[in-house]
């Protein structure tokens, strides 16, 4: 209870608007969206903040942004601007935040704090700290948060005392225990990240490794899972939660707590290898413990998270202090890891550009789990299970609904196709910050009755949705992050004998063989996407041959068992070198 109270209290004192928005999103309540829309319609026009707040709760961030940009800042009080600016930053709408907050000189504390939040959001970390220092005391939660995070980005490391270190392996045998440190995990998070982690570990278990996991400090309480247990055992893998009695929410203190928890686990387990994943804050704790105990460690680079961060911001974010430091810290931990693991050739090339030796890097691509090794569910049966008609053609995706996935382009392409193909349906499975915006766009395009949005589904049901599709679509936007990172869901679609139409980006070329397992189209062109879809929708034999070829390729090249065999050998070589 103390940890829960600390998490809620710190978030409310730091950025209450963002915390309320995140909490409302986790509810995933349609009634909440309806309530926001209803209340917004009843409020008088002068109730500016309440109008904006109900739009925010409804999840329609596009409409909220339009509303905020329509307001005249000079006619609004400092306090009102502060509240509206906080909403703009919370929904990641920098244009609206700039419209409201820039060029307003003030000594008002609330408005200055909002301006600092916008500066921080843009990556101007030192500027945000200096602005806060002029208006709030050193004890202010927001200021302490920013200072601590800036310290970590600038090089602060956790420190272990002598009692927590200097353990070395003894004897001639190589310990066959691997300790993993993760950002999140099953059963509380069902993301591709969590599924990949679990697949790697269960497959390593089949190779004779004992696996145990620690998750980041405060998780899963920090995502609202207040009834979580201290340990979850899933398929023989123990997921232990780091839930300290005195939880620290500042980044530096949190990394320190994580290092202490890892040191404790090392003394208990005597592991042969430590393994963690992006981002670098995970690696700082693992690196500190690995060096103190003389244990090899693997850094698994699953994304270029500085680019992911920049993808939701103006182009100027790539010249910001945060972006520069983020890149530097990621390169620093990768350079210090005993071994680096990544998802594909595009990401390996980026690591080599950062100065990581080729010989130090190996690839474990996103792969298919045991359920996808089974024969795909026949399409008619899958649709019957889901209540979908065999009279329709379904195009769509199973994905996190975020902006860089480019699903608005899919809807625009569908709007071009539907007049000539009224049997066409768009199936978008998943949840995320763009969910309400996509539904709103489908209404604006006049195709809402042709679109199905089931929301987030259990991972075992995702396979059924894959099998129900005629074509799986990956219309990702052309960004640094999408050029480098290979997603998991298209791999699963191909394993289900579903052809894939995808944006022609380097990472997606590693998955889709153009003309054989799917079609690659120039990114960010709804018309070209529509043309590729039209061609495949009109050729059932081509869809069938592409689907069969895709499944053969996935079974031959992308299984977790094959990944685990290679990773197990890597673990053994690393541990053997340090005996």
Q: Language-model segments: what does each one mean?
A:
Residues 1-53, 59, 139-232, 237:
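N-terminal subdomain of nucleotide-sugar transferases
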Residues 164-166, 374-388:
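A short helix/loop element that forms part of the nucleotide-sugar donor recognition site in Leloir-type
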Residues 178-180, 389-414:
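Conserved donor-binding/catalytic core segment of Leloir-type glycosyltransferases
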Residues 217, 346, 367:
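Carbohydrate-associated surface elements
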Residues 384, 423, 528, 535, ...:
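A short, well-ordered alpha-helix in the C-terminal region of glycosyltransferases
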Residues 437-461:
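Nucleotide-activated donor-binding/catalytic signature segment of Leloir-type glycosyltransferases, i.e.
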Residues 474, 492-495, 499-502:
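Short hydrophobic beta-strand element within catalytic cores of glycosyltransferases
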Residues 514-515, 519-526, 535-541:
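Conserved acidic donor-binding segment of nucleotide-sugar-dependent glycosyltransferases
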């Amino acid at each position: 209870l103390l940890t829960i109270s600390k998490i809620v209290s710190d978030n409310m004192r730091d950025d209450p608007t963002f915390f309320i928005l995140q909490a409302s999103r986790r509810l995933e309540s349609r009634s909440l969206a309806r309530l926001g829309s209803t209340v917004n319609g009843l409020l008088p026009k002068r109730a500016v903040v309440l109008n904006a707040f109900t739009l925010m709760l409804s999840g329609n961030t596009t409409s909220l942004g339009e509303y905020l940009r329509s307001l005249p800042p000079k006619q609004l009080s400092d306090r009102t601007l502060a509240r509206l600016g906080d909403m703009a930053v919370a929904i990641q709408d920098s244009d609206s935040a700039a419209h409201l907050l820039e060029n307003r000189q003030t000594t008002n504390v609330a408005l200055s704090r909002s301006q600092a939040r916008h500066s921080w959001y843009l990556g101007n970390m030192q500027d945000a700290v200096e602005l806060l220092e002029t208006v709030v005391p050193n004890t202010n939660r927001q200021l302490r948060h920013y200072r601590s995070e800036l310290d970590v980005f600038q090089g602060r490391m956790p420190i272990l005392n002598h009692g927590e270190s200097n353990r070395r392996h003894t004897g001639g045998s190589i310990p066959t225990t691997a300790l993993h440190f993760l950002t999140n995990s099953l059963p509380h998070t069902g993301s591709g990240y969590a599924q990949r982690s679990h697949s790697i570990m269960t497959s390593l278990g089949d190779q004779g490794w004992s696996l145990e996991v620690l998750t980041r400090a405060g998780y899963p309480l920090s995502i609202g899972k207040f009834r979580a247990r201290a340990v979850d055992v899933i398929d023989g893998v123990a997921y232990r939660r780091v839930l300290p009695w005195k939880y620290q929410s500042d980044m530096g203190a949190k990394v320190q707590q994580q290092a202490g928890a890892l040191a404790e686990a090392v003394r208990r387990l005597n592991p042969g290898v430590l393994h963690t994943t992006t981002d670098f804050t995970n690696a700082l704790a693992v690196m500190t413990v690995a060096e103190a105990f003389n244990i090899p460690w693997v850094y698994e680079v699953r994304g270029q998270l500085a680019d992911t961060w920049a993808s939701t911001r103006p182009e100027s974010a790539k010249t910001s202090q945060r972006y520069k430091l983020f890149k530097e810290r990621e390169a620093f931990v990768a350079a210090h890891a005993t071994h680096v693991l990544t998802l594909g050739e595009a990401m390996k090339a980026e690591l080599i550009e950062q100065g990581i030796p080729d010989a130090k890097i190996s690839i474990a691509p996103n792969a298919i789990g045991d359920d996808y090794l089974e024969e795909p569910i026949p399409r008619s049966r899958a649709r019957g299970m889901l209540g979908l008609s065999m009279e329709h053609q379904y195009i769509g995706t199973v994905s996190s609904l975020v902006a860089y996935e480019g699903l608005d382009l899919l809807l625009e392409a569908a709007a071009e196709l539907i007049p000539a193909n009224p049997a066409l349906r768009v199936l978008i499975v998943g949840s995320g910050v763009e969910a309400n915006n996509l539904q709103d766009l489908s209404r604006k395009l006049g195709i809402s009755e042709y679109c199905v949005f089931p929301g987030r589904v259990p991972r075992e049901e995702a396979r059924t949705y894959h099998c129900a599709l005629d074509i799986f679509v990956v219309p990702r936007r052309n960004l640094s992050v999408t050029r480098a990172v290979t997603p998991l869901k298209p791999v699963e679609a191909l394993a289900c004998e579903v052809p894939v139409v995808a944006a022609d980006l380097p990472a997606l070329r590693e998955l889709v063989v153009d003309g054989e397992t799917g079609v690659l189209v120039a990114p960010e062109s709804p018309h070209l996407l529509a043309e590729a879809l039209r061609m495949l929708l009109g050729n059932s034999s081509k869809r069938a041959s592409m689907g069969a070829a895709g499944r053969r390729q996935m079974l031959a090249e992308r299984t977790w068992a094959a990944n685990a065999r290679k990773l197990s050998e890597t673990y053994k070589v690393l541990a053997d070198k340090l005996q």
